[in-house]
Amino acid sequence: MGTHMYSEQGINNTINISTTSLTNATQLTVIGNNNSVYIGNNCKIVSSNIRLKGNNITLFIADDVENMGLVCSLHSDCSLQIQAKTTMGNGEITIAEKGKISIGKDCMLAHGYEIRNTDMHPIYSLENGERINHGKDVIIGNHVWLGRNVTILKGVCIPNNVVVGSHTVLYKSFKEPNCVIAGSPAKIVKENIVWGRKMYHSTMYDDPTLNEFYK
């Protein structure tokens, strides 16, 4: 399980961290009631700072997830789901306003990513006084690769098998899978692609992990 620090203030909190997972140099803080933390089998959560502050918060990390240096803040009635075999460099995730961020299976997030479902400060209309920048959920599909220093803002949905180029800021959703998104403003720059993790394969047919994309 490794060395980690865990602190809790509140009641009816459930913390379930698999004994097969490594959580070295990680700080997990839970402040509030009725919160749930699940970290599955064979995960590596290293040098991370995860903070749940509020009530009815859910953190779910599936099996075989690797995370090196996550700074994560979740507020009341929010949830973060990271599905199996996703790997993440150092980065920041912020969830508030009863929102959700979901990251699919077998994703790869390079260092410097920032994902948030909220602006964290209100903006009001001078015409009627109403707030105009409410939080919105963020959904990242399966097998998505975020390059270095990518920013994902509130309300963004990314389909399966997408590459997002380094330093791209995504503020709107895309519907087309199997593509590369890059630039400022972000746009599709390449279509009909699939990406892999290993450099030594000559073609996609040599990589058994990609079978589902062409069969």
Curated annotation (Swiss-Prot):
Catalytic activity: [(2->6)-alpha-D-glucosyl-(1->4)-N-acetyl-alpha-D-neuraminosyl](n) + n acetyl-CoA = [(2->6)-alpha-D-glucosyl-(1->4)-N,7-O-diacetyl-alpha-D-neuraminosyl](n) + n CoA; [(2->6)-alpha-D-glucosyl-(1->4)-N-acetyl-alpha-D-neuraminosyl](n) + n acetyl-CoA = [(2->6)-alpha-D-glucosyl-(1->4)-N,O(9)-diacetyl-alpha-D-neuraminosyl](n) + n CoA
Keyword Nucleotide-binding listed: no
Single GO biological process annotation from the record: protein homotrimerization
Signal peptide: none
Keyword check for Calcium: no
GO-annotated molecular function: polysialic-acid O-acetyltransferase activity
Superkingdom field: Bacteria
Entry-linked SUPFAM superfamilies: Trimeric LpxA-like enzymes (SSF51161)
InterPro entries, sorted: Hexapep, Hexapeptide_acetyltransf, Trimer_LpxA-like_sf
Disulfide bonds: none
Sites where the protein binds acetyl-CoA: 119-121, 148, 154, 166, 171-172, 190
Its EC number(s): 2.3.1.-
Known role: Catalyzes the O-acetylation of capsular polymeric sialic acid consisting of polymers of (2->6)-alpha-D-glucosyl-(1->4)-N-acetyl-alpha-D-neuraminosyl residues. Shows high substrate specificity toward polymers of sialic acid that contains a large number of residues.
Further remark: Polymeric sialic acid-containing capsule provides a means for the bacteria to evade the immune response during infection by mimicking host sialic acid-containing cell surface structures. O-acetylation of the sialic acid residues of capsular polysaccharides alters their immunogenicity and susceptibility to glycosidases.
Subunit annotation: Homotrimer.
Family per record: Belongs to the transferase hexapeptide repeat family.
Protein name: Polysialic acid O-acetyltransferase
Source organism of the structure: Neisseria meningitidis
Lineage start: Bacteria, Pseudomonadati, Pseudomonadota, Betaproteobacteria, Neisseriales
